[in-house]
Amino acid sequence: LTARAYFDGADAAESKLRADITALWEAVEWDFFTKEGTEKVLYWHWSPDKGSAMNMPIQGWNEALIVYVLAASSPTHPIGREVYAEGWARGGAMRNGKSFYDTVLPLGEDYGGPLFWTHYSFLGLNPRGLSDAYADYWEQVCNHTRINYAYCVDNPKGYAGYGADCWGLTPSDIPDGYTASSPTNDRGVIAPTAALSSMPYTPDESMAALRFFYYKLGDKLWSDYGFIDSFDLTSGWFDRGMHIAI
């Protein structure tokens, strides 16, 4: 849809591109993913042979706001207001409202959860000036990021390296597998994507992390494909060979 708006020329190539994008956009049956209108929530999965057997509802607060925005704005298969209110917002239960490190968190779990929740929807949706009955989303993403940063600076578990220039908890590889790191699930592993993808929200803090990652950790963290996925300075583990494209 971003490309559809950008390529606005009258020539045949751009006109065809817009037509193809429009066809794809209008073909998505968002309302089907409410179990064909029987429930007031969208579901993550459906397949021709297993149907909705995975039975996983999409509910906030997390990275999936963009799904509900696209579904609500569909010109052909929109969801109703009640699906957004009861499904995504859980009837208001996605609100938080408590303070962590002197910062109010409008939505989500305590301490905000993993930082990718502030990133994915807003690759294509501007949170500035975006609000609904539940939150101002610019306040949400900025405060979530500030809490994640403050937690790493506080470093209550005493992990090596954590601080004002080395921070950011989000899903990544860890030495013994994979986990969704957050202040409530802290395994001592920093993921560069967490701080760097938060540049619009915490420009000074994110730039400090960028300088540390690049100039201080250098080749331990940087490769031909950019920064590696994650690292643990307590054990000296670096996830060499693994990258994530965000």
What are the residue ranges of the model-derived segments?
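Ser/Thr/Asn(+Pro)-rich, low-complexity disordered segments
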Residues: 1-245
